[in-house]
């Protein structure tokens, strides 16, 4: 179970030396993702919050640097809670929330499982669909996990709080459910591959911290491996793995979810000198941060892929943001940028929902 929960970067590198390079890619900056946490700063150069995560920093003798939350020390867990309000949700709560989304779409309860206290009983019958809806429609639903951490709402290889390993037939993630639907409705490898690719292209998540983001991408990649091996009793070819990794490098991206830019990428602007006597070196605060205007940030705005056109687009375009059929995430997630929020902060889920 140790290897299953904590995916070793050295193992991925040995599997295919291109995979980690793809999984580390940040398409918004056209560089690698950044650490965006000071938890690794004690290691020195290459591990500071604004440093890009290099392959050599997490492989070879550094192959054990990145660990899932459940494998981190309590001290480190508490520090991340304090610094970035990092919250991980047990699988049974993720299941309740995912069930709620499915109840809305299927127009009935207990579609994939029945909740029983802090666990669930799997519905083993083939899933049926409401009139006018098909299994293909379900697979294509665009689902976003906000502030996704290790992506427990999307895939549930293990409980991110307890570390308990979940067998395939007991998984509750949104992508797990889509792959189950594909399994129930196709009978050959080509169709299975094509529809699972559609499922991945419709599954999204963003995260601030680089280590958690990489783990999320790894979890989604190995979810593909888990289901492929179970279905075809063989390991997927490298081309399949690289295809999935490339999708994940776009769909699971690094972002400040309140500003829609790469974390901490906003920089002060040079002040315009109005007179000879003014200090022309005094910088001005990022206008977007100062005015709480998301169209005026000096940071690097994040890009996502429009898979219908195979062209990248900015996630935030003026007052328009990419929309999704369902948005899921930790219940406390709120917008803390509006006024005095000591007692109340408005939720942000609706900002991403399809209208």
What are these regions (language model features)?
Residues 2-355:
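SAM-dependent methyltransferase catalytic region
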């Amino acid at each position: 179970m140790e290897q299953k929960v904590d995916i070793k970067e050295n193992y991925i590198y040995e599997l295919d030396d291109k995979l980690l390079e793809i999984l580390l890619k940040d398409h918004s900056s056209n560089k690698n993702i950044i650490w965006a946490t000071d938890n690794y700063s004690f290691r020195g150069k290459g591990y500071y919050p604004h440093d890009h995560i290099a392959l050599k920093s997490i492989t070879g003798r550094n192959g054990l640097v990145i660990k899932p939350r459940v494998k981190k020390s309590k001290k480190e867990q508490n520090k991340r809670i304090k610094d970035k309000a990092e919250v991980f949700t047990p699988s049974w709560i993720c299941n309740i929330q995912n069930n709620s989304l499915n109840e809305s779409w299927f127009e009935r309860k207990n579609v994939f499982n029945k909740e029983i206290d802090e666990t669930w009983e799997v519905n083993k019958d083939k899933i049926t669909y409401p009139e006018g809806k098909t299994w293909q429609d379900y697979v294509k639903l665009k689902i976003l996990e906000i502030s996704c951490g290790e992506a427990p709402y999307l895939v549930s290889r293990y409980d991110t709080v307890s570390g308990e390993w979940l067998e395939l037939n007991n998984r509750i993630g949104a992508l797990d459910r889509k792959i189950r639907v594909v399994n129930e409705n196709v009978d050959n490898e080509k169709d299975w591959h094509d529809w699972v690719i559609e499922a991945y292209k419709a599954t999204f998540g963003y995260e601030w911290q680089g280590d958690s983001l990489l783990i999320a991408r790894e979890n989604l990649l190995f979810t593909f491996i888990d289901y492929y091996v179970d279905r075809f009793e063989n390991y997927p070819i490298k081309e399949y793995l690289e295809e999935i990794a490339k999708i994940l490098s776009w769909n699971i991206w690094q972002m400040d979810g309140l500003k829609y830019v790469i974390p901490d990428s906003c920089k002060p602007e040079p002040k315009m000198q109005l007179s000879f006597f003014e200090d022309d070196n005094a910088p001005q605060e990022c206008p977007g941060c100062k005015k709480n205007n998301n169209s005026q940030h000096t940071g690097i705005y994040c890009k996502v892929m429009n898979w219908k056109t195979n062209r990248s687009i900015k996630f935030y375009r003026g007052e328009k943001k990419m929309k999704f059929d369902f948005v899921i995430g930790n219940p406390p997630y709120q917008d803390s940028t509006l006024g005095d929020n000591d007692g109340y902060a408005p939720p942000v889920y609706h900002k991403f929902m399809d209208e």
